[in-house]
Amino acid sequence: MTHYHFVGIKGSGMSSLAQIMHDLGHEVQGSDIDQYVFTEKALRNKGIKILPFNPDNIEKGMTIIQGNAFSDTHEEIVRAHELDLEVIDYPTFLGHVIEQYISIAVTGAHGKTSTTGLLSHVMNGDKRTSFLIGDGTGLGIPQSEFFAFEACEYRRHFLSYHPDYAIMTNIDFDHPDYFKDVDDVTNAFQEMAYNVKKGIVAWGKDEHLRKIKADVPIYYYGLEKNEDIYADNIQITEHGTQFDVYIDGKYFDQFLSPQYGDHNILNTLAVIMVCHLEGLDIENIKEALETFGGVKRRFNETKLHNQVLVDDYAHHPREINATIETARKKYPNKEVIAVFQPHTFSRTKAFLEEFAESLSKADRVFLCDIFGSIREHDGSLTIQDLIDRIPGAQLIGENNVNILNEFDNAVILFMGAGDIQKIERAYMENNGVTNEF
C-alpha cells in the first residue's frame, strides 16, 4: 500500500484519480484551496482527507501527485523535493496506472466527459471497468479488465498516455492560451494517434480527424451511411432517442438512448463500436445504455414549478449550440433561456463573435461576469463586450436572479466552466429550494 498526497485534489481529474487509488486500497489524502468545489463531495463520501495547502502536509514516505495547475514553486512541491520524495505529475501518473488494463482513452475538444461517462457505464454492464471521468468521478474496481478514461489535449497532456483504444470525438480550436490555431490542435491529435496500440474510433464528419494517420485501424462513426458505424431510422420518443445501428454497411441492432440530441447519438455510436471491437455482449450493452443517467454538469436537470433548470459545463460556442439543441428537442414547447458565465478571458476574447452567435439561438440571454483562470489577469475585456453583441442580453448576478421568475414555462440553461452554479443555487434558494451540487 502506498501513501499518496494529491496537490490540487479538487481538480476534476485529480479528484477522480484520488478516488481510484483509494478504491484500490491505497492511503490517499490531498490538499487544495479552502473553497467549496463540486468535486469534493465524492471525496468526502469516500472518507478521503482534504487539507488546506500547507507544506506541513508533506511527510516522509509519501508519493506526491502534482496537479497540472501547480508549478514546482508551490510550497508543498518545494517541501516534497526537500524531503527527497517522489513527485509525479498527473498525466504521467495516470499513464502508469492505465498500463495494467485494456485502456480506452476518450479525447476531443468537446464531448469527452459525456462520452467517458457513457462508455464506463455501458462497459460495466458486461465487464468490470475502472474509470476516470472529468466530472470528478472515479472508480477503481479490483480485478478490472478495462479502464476508461478522459484524456485532455490541453498542453498536450494526453501524450503521456499509450492506450489500447482512443475515441476521438472531434477537433476544434480551444485553449487559445496554449494552442496557436486549429492546425496546432490537429498536430497534437496526430501525435496522440501514434500512441494508440489497437484502434481509433473517430467522428467521420470532422475534417480534421479525417486527416489523422495512425499505425492502427481507424473506425469512423457518424450519421452518414459511408461511415464504418452509423445510425439510421432515428426516432425521438418520450423515453429518449431510438435508432438502428449499422456496422460495415450491415444492420447490427436497434438501440434506445435516454438522451436527446445528435451529439449524444454520436457519443453512443463511438461507445458501441469500442464494445463491438472488444466482443462485449450486445444485449448487456443495450440494457446498460437504457439506464445511463448522465454525468455531472452535463445537462443535469432540476424541476422548479413549471421550469426546468439545467446545470451544464458548456463553455465553448460549439458546446452551447449542442446544449441549446438538446433543450429544444427534449422540451419543444418551452422557452429556452440561456444564463452563461464565460470562462477565461483568453477564450472569451478569441471566440467573442462565436459566443454571441451561439447564445443568440436561445430565446433570452443573461450573462455573468467573466470567470478568469488562476493563470490570467486581463482587464482589457469585460462582459459588456459580449452583452453588446447579443440583442436583449442582460447582466445577471446572485443579487438579481429573481428576474428569471418571469419565464414560467421555460428551460433555463445555467452554462459555464467556472462557478456558474452559484447563480442557479441563489435562484433556487430565492424560490425556497436548497440543492447541493
From Swiss-Prot:
GO cellular component: cytoplasm
GO BP, sorted A to Z: cell division; cell wall organization; peptidoglycan biosynthetic process; regulation of cell shape
SUPFAM superfamilies on file: MurCD N-terminal domain, MurD-like peptide ligases, catalytic domain, MurD-like peptide ligases, peptide-binding domain
Residues where ATP binds: 108-114
Pathway the protein acts in: Cell wall biogenesis; peptidoglycan biosynthesis
GO molecular-function terms, A-Z: ATP binding; UDP-N-acetylmuramate-L-alanine ligase activity
Keywords: ATP-binding, Cell cycle, Cell division, Cell shape, Cell wall biogenesis/degradation, Cytoplasm, Ligase, Nucleotide-binding, Peptidoglycan synthesis
Pfam families reported for this sequence: Mur_ligase, Mur_ligase_C, Mur_ligase_M
Annotated catalysed reactions: UDP-N-acetyl-alpha-D-muramate + L-alanine + ATP = UDP-N-acetyl-alpha-D-muramoyl-L-alanine + ADP + phosphate + H(+)
Location within or outside the cell: Cytoplasm
Enzyme Commission code: 6.3.2.8
Main location: cytoplasm
Annotated function: Cell wall formation.
Family: Belongs to the MurCDEF family.
Matches recorded under NCBIfam families: murC
Entry protein name: UDP-N-acetylmuramate--L-alanine ligase
Organism from which the protein derives: Staphylococcus carnosus (strain TM300)
